[in-house]
Amino acid sequence: MLALLVLITLPAKADEACRALAGVALAHARVESAIEQPGVDFPVKGDRLAAHAGAHCAVRVVSHPTTDSDIHFELWLPPAGAWNGKYLQKGSGGWGGEVYTYALVTPLNRGYATAVTDDGHVADGTARFTVGHPQKIRDFGYRAIHETSVLSRRLIAAYYQRAASQAYFVGCSDGGREALMQAQRFPADFDGIVAGAPAARWSHLMTAFVANARLLDNAPLPSSKLAAIQKASLASCDALDGVRDGIVDDPRRCRFDPAAIQCKAGDNDDCLTAQQVATVRALYAGPVDPVTGARIHPGLEPGMEDDGGSWRLWILGGEQRKFGFSNFADLVYQGQGWDSTGSDIHRDLAAAQEREAPYLDAFNPDLRAFRAHGGKLLLFHGWGDAAVPPRGTIEYVQDVGNFMSRHGEPANLDGFVRLFMVPGMGHCWGGPGATSFGNEEVPPAALTQDADHDIVMALDRWVTQGKAPEQLIATRPVEPANSSARTRLLCKYPQVARNGRCVAAGNPP
């Protein structure tokens, strides 16, 4: 009888504690609802896996730090007996604009109190939300993430009657940019951060998107040519690591020149015209400022040109064009008639640096305060990423080391920053390689969930136990689900995997 009373009383107390959060006083914010949920099921949707979130208190909050701000977020709180004592916040993607609760399933089921924000607006796939709303640019750039962090921890303390022992942030793409922004602007918000494929040089990246679109308008590259380009780049560079597996292990060592498949006569899908050779070379090299000659952003890497989530989607499928054009037409020029066909790349870059870089760019190398806080930062980037070219992330880590050295800090960043480059992976996940290592919102069933195979678990172990990850094991699930999965070693940059071990890399350019 006593046991039965306990079983009845515990859910009732949890529901009462959850509903009580509606009365918590929050600066310039309010709890819209706080409801005890027995669980939430997410069906398969596109390439999204089906998932089930366990019981939790779902708290919806709206914050108005300025009169122009309308920041929404949702916080999921596991039952007190299931809480691991920690807080994990997820980042957004693209232009944000949605409280994407699917991202909360895995951290909740692992015992985290977890939250995600809409970045302060409702999305329509463009930057139109910024027109006439300068504060919403700041909300999107950095403020919504910080507000969500501060308010969530206030609610966590009220619900559990104790503060979270650790706080983590995990994001990829724009979420990766948000992750670096937190380390740079709000170094005490999080004890550990995972930044995947960070769109850190936002103003430069958007300018590069427009430059690439202009390049392809003037010198088109048919998608039917991508298979020949990839076949040739793999023939040139796949075996440089000693293994022919359809993956370029380190594209920086690749010397592929598309002129190798220039048409000798006529034109067909197995070769490139002279103009197409020049176009592909320019895409690999990255766009330059036509006035100064300075490179605007690193270019694309060889080896995944024909992958559905790489060049086929981002370069020829219009994704770069869509993001870049809206960035300038709506955010930078505020709907004042920017003409994509007659745009001046030099002028556009200068305008972007003036009007959006102060709020969106996140490549400040000064991480002294984050290091002093005891923060740990793990970065990852796919070598086949055609959305955010990967060399920019390597350059950022190098810039941090150089900055620290110039300011009397240890140049060796191993104590708080580590980067993992992922061969055969596109943007954030996916591609022909082994690309599952805790980076997806919901991991596939074949993924071993421990700190050797999961980057978020590796971060937690580093923060709580002081054991930094030297390597990760990435998995490529195969069907049927009970078949053996393919794995690949991911090494701490600048090391590379050779014969099942991480070894020092050579000297790529």
Tell where the protein language model's regions lie, with residue ranges:
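A catalytic-pocket lid/entrance helix-loop region that shapes and gates access to the active site
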Residues: 181-183, 188-288, 421, 437-453
